[in-house]
């Protein structure tokens, strides 16, 4: 098992560890939580399924380790690199550069926001729960308290909702 550790926004790292808790490496579960500040160990590796988009980003963006770059990995999230039957060997292609890490971070943020927006809309229209309370529940469930401002997520949701409702009003002629 070859792993790669990258640095992403702290709230996205927490989201991933809760979202993919069932995909954590079994022998690593006894280690301290990656969200604890006392932990100086490498975060627990997440083993993603081949059906997740992030798995394919990891596969496509992994490159051979550059000779002038340290082998010491730092970051707040660790992934097990894909090991397909054919294609890139993770023993060789085991490095994710800074730009690639930003690309992966953006994809994680897209996944998180899609889940958040679906959660907010479903709670509002099926369960009658107000957006603010739903946002609090989402942030609490994914252990993101203190790492993200709920107001910024709510503003982004409202901008998205305004854009979506505007595009539905203007039909092509």
Language-model regions: role of each:
Residues 36, 163-166:
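Short, compositionally biased segments
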Residues 130-143:
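DNA-recognition alpha helix
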Residues 1-96:
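Long, low-complexity interaction regions most often at the N-terminus
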Residues 98-113:
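Basic, short loop/linker segments at the boundary and entry of helix-turn-helix/winged-helix-like folds
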Residues 109-129:
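Short, amphipathic alpha-helical "recognition" segments used to contact nucleic acids or chromatin
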Residues 167-173:
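Conserved small/polar residues in nucleotide/adenosyl-binding loops
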Residues 147-162:
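Major-groove recognition helix of helix-turn-helix-like DNA-binding domains
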């Amino acid at each position: 098992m070859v792993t790669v550790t990258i640095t992403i926004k702290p709230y996205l790292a927490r989201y991933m560890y809760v979202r993919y808790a069932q995909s954590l490496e079994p022998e690593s579960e006894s280690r301290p939580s990656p969200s604890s500040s006392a932990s100086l160990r490498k975060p627990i590796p997440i083993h993603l399924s081949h059906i997740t988009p992030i798995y394919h980003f990891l596969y496509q963006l992994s490159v051979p380790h550059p000779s002038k770059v340290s082998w010491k990995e730092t970051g707040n999230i660790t992934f097990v690199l894909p090991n397909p039957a054919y294609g890139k060997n993770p023993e060789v292609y085991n490095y994710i550069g800074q730009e690639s890490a930003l690309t992966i971070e953006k994809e994680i943020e897209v996944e998180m926001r899609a889940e958040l927006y679906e959660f907010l809309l479903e709670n509002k229209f099926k369960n009658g729960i107000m957006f603010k309370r739903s946002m609090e529940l989402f942030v609490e469930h994914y252990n993101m308290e203190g790492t993200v401002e709920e107001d910024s997520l709510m503003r982004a949701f409202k901008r998205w909702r305004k854009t979506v409702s505007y595009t539905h009003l203007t039909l092509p002629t």
